[in-house]
Amino acid sequence: MTDKKPTIEPGWNFDNSYTTLPKSFFSRLNPPPVRSPKLAILNERLAKSLGLNVEALQSEEVIAMLAGNKTPEGAMPLAQAYAGHQFGHFTMLGDGRALLLGEQITPTGERFDIQLKGSGRTPYSRGGDGRAALGPMLREYIISEAMHGLGIPTTRSLAVVTTGESVYRESELPGAILTRVAASHIRVGTFQFAARFCSIEDLRALADYTLQRHFPEIETEENRYLLLLKGVIQRQAALIAKWQLVGFIHGVMNTDNMAISGETIDYGPCAFMDTYDPATVFSSIDVQGRYAYGNQPYIAVWNLSRFAESLLPLLHENEAQAVKIAEDVLAEFSKLYHSNWLTGMRAKLGLFNEEEQDEALIEGLLNMMKEHRADYTNTFRALTLNQPEETVLFGTSEFTEWHEQWKARLTRQPEDTDAVQQGMKKNNPAVIPRNHRVEEALEAAWKEGDYTVMERLLTVLSDPYAYTPEQVEYTTLPAESARPYQTFCGT
């Protein structure tokens, strides 16, 4: 007896261009089936933008596809090979619990990877069970969608499906599979793998494929590999600046977690900073603070140096010349990052033009925030709403002096008060996914099966710059008993 097809086609439109790469870059396999897949949450807006039918995605057959029990028409599931530096140590990696179904071509002609995360063991599993727990998959769903709402390039979450099976970590937990959507899953670690374990022809094939996929405007240029390095550096400089501007801490900036596309990828022990402190670390495994908030720009350039090393054979046949070329380009990161960050900080303070003293004004505020343990997001929110009395800085002599300097600075530009406030609202989120709110939503969802708390949180986070009355309750700080907050590498 054949399975009944859904009455409405789901809208899959798969291409599998990654399979045109040399076979060393992937392993083809179908995921092992799970016992009893059920849809936990579906991102309807994202589904529609991908050209998928929301009703069909909720059918038993398509849920089975999102669980790996069936292969969608046109998909060619594969696990990607890559390597990477994890906390500074090089190791062979690969998709240990994820499978790329293929690339969905949208009605507008865009191409997005569709990946199942938590789909079972692969040749790269390195002793792991290949599965994922429901809590961490829902957490990635929340944080990635919050990042999208903030306007930060990111992978997206299409759905989470429960498996009806348990996974065993410190305790027995419900299993789940996340459907992740990405511009691609090509990582710095993919290039490290090619440079270390493959031929120069394979490395060139990967670089050419990456150019075609992410930098088509330069794929025919004579110095295209140099331009590829420059392009990736530019995108990462812009991305890391955006992270810093909203207080996002990735937590595990290994080279395999840096996407060539310039999207934020792999939401493991990430979190948003409450109290401003450049030394903030949330990850339980980052005991040295390697990936602390203030270190993120430095780690980015370290990772990009590993990318540049991988490209050396393509930059020049003479190794010394290739190294010189790479070093010259890498030296641009600091300037690019700083320019992006300074532009963003000016916007957060309502500054439409540039003055030389702006950086001192910005640093003055940040130093006060650190000294008085002020909340990063809420301080900028209070300034945006012209409610300085709402900050813990209010009443201190240094803040009074700073506030006067800032007000005087605002008068030296043509924009009126209204324009300044509107500009600040576009750059200072009223809400972020605060750690205690995320935990509250996850507890209700995976422990009690109540997704209403999570859905409310997602609605608020989908438009963080709206400054609506509904958002106010989500601006409250965690109780002292909830600090210090720690995150774990559950994803």
From Swiss-Prot:
Its cofactor is Mg(2+); Mn(2+). It is an enzyme of class 2 (transferase). Pfam families: SelO. The keyword Transport does not apply. It catalyses: L-seryl-[protein] + ATP = 3-O-(5'-adenylyl)-L-seryl-[protein] + diphosphate; L-threonyl-[protein] + ATP = 3-O-(5'-adenylyl)-L-threonyl-[protein] + diphosphate; L-tyrosyl-[protein] + ATP = O-(5'-adenylyl)-L-tyrosyl-[protein] + diphosphate; L-histidyl-[protein] + UTP = N(tele)-(5'-uridylyl)-L-histidyl-[protein] + diphosphate. It comes from the Bacteria. GO terms for molecular function: AMPylase activity; ATP binding; magnesium ion binding. Keywords: ATP-binding, Magnesium, Manganese, Metal-binding, Nucleotide-binding, Nucleotidyltransferase, Transferase. ATP binds at G94, G96, R97, K117, D129, G130, R180, R187, D266. The keyword Metal-binding applies. Mg(2+) binds at N257, D266. Its EC number is 2.7.7.-, 2.7.7.108. The active site is at D256. Nucleotidyltransferase involved in the post-translational modification of proteins. It can catalyze the addition of adenosine monophosphate (AMP) or uridine monophosphate (UMP) to a protein, resulting in modifications known as AMPylation and UMPylation. This is Protein nucleotidyltransferase YdiU. It comes from Brevibacillus brevis (strain 47 / JCM 6285 / NBRC 100599). The lineage of its organism: Bacteria, Bacillati, Bacillota, Bacilli, Bacillales.
